[in-house]
Swiss-Prot record:
Name of this chain's protein: Ribonuclease 3
Subunit organization: Homodimer.
DRBM domain span: 163-231
Species the sequence originates in: Chlorobium chlorochromatii (strain CaD3)
Catalytic activities: Endonucleolytic cleavage to 5'-phosphomonoester
All residue ranges annotated as the RNase III domain in the record: 6-136
Cellular-component GO terms for this entry: cytoplasm
Entry's EC annotation: 3.1.26.3
Catalytic residues in the record: 53, 125
Annotated residues for binding of Mg(2+): 49, 122, 125
CDD domains, alphabetized: DSRM_RNAse_III_family (cd10845), RIBOc (cd00593)
Record carries keyword Magnesium: yes
Taxonomy, superkingdom: Bacteria
SUPFAM superfamilies documented for this protein: dsRNA-binding domain-like (SSF54768), RNase III domain-like (SSF69065)
Top-level taxonomy: Bacteria, Pseudomonadati, Chlorobiota, Chlorobiia, Chlorobiales
Length: 248
């Protein structure tokens, strides 16, 4: 593994615990296999991508199940699909500079596969699979929490599949707090061409929205509040210190 890639991985996920080869496989594109110049690499990241896809699906399903208790199965499935599709995963991969460290065959490098949506998405899932094998589910949770749940685009992805006002009601019910309160705080324009600015408050979290109809302004306010709530939510999992809990 190139020294710069080793340093990159150690910065990204911590100690590799003697499993550098596992992570190297996670970064190995299938174009490498059969490449005589890289004959020492005999496995691509496709198997790890298969595993990482399943682990990621579980973690995102857990997050959505816990945070949207009133959402129907179909709505949760649509939201999960949008989070884990290739476009979204490639975005998350680019944000951590993953493409710069992909190991590619000569032909793939020539066609700029390094920045392709599918290659980045596959490598991102492969890395999650490697983390799971090396460090366990808690570490995989931590990686997903940091690089997906708290990514700047995550709240917008989730909100795009939700009715924002309904989401706020679900949140208030799940956390046993008062229902959201909507207040018109400003009106602008002539009587026939007004714009309304609405503020919503829920559990001391506020959001604002402006639109020509109060109903639309309320939705925009709820969207902003939900984005702030999601940004503050950790994954609903507390790592267990099994060593400390075991008596000797």
């Amino acid at each position: 593994m190139p020294p710069e890639t080793l340093a990159y991985l150690q910065t990204l996920i911590g100690s590799l615990d003697g499993n550098a080869r596992l992570y190297q496989t996670a970064l190995t594109h299938r174009s490498v296999i059969g490449n005589t110049a890289l004959s020492h690499h005999n496995e691509s990241n496709q198997r790890l991508e298969f595993l990482g896809d399943a682990v990621l699906g579980l973690l995102i399903s857990h997050f959505l199940f816990q945070n949207f208790p009133a959402s129907a199965e179909g709505d949760l499935s649509k939201t999960r699909a949008k989070i884990v599709n290739s476009k979204s995963l490639a975005c998350f991969a680019r944000s951590i500079g993953l493409g710069e460290h992909l190991l590619l065959g000569e032909s793939a490098a020539h066609y700029n596969i390094r920045d392709s949506e599918s290659a980045l998405a596959d490598a991102f899932e492969s890395l999650i699979g490697a983390i799971y094998l090396d460090k366990g589910l808690d570490a995989a949770y931590g990686f997903v929490d940091k690089h997906i749940i708290h990514h700047q685009s995550f709240s917008a992805i989730v909100a795009s599949e939700q009715n924002y006002k309904s989401c706020l009601i679900e949140y208030s019910q799940a956390h046993h707090v008062a229902a959201p309160v909507y207040t018109v705080i400003a009106e602008h324009g002539a009587e026939h061409d007004k714009e309304f600015t609405v503020e919503v408050s829920c559990n001391n979290i506020k959001g604002c929205g402006t639109a020509r109809r109060k109903k639309d302004a309320e939705q925009l306010a709820a969207k902003e509040a939900m984005e702030r709530i999601i940004a503050l939510q950790p994954l609903p999992h507390e790592p267990k210190d099994e060593e400390n809990s075991t008596t000797t």
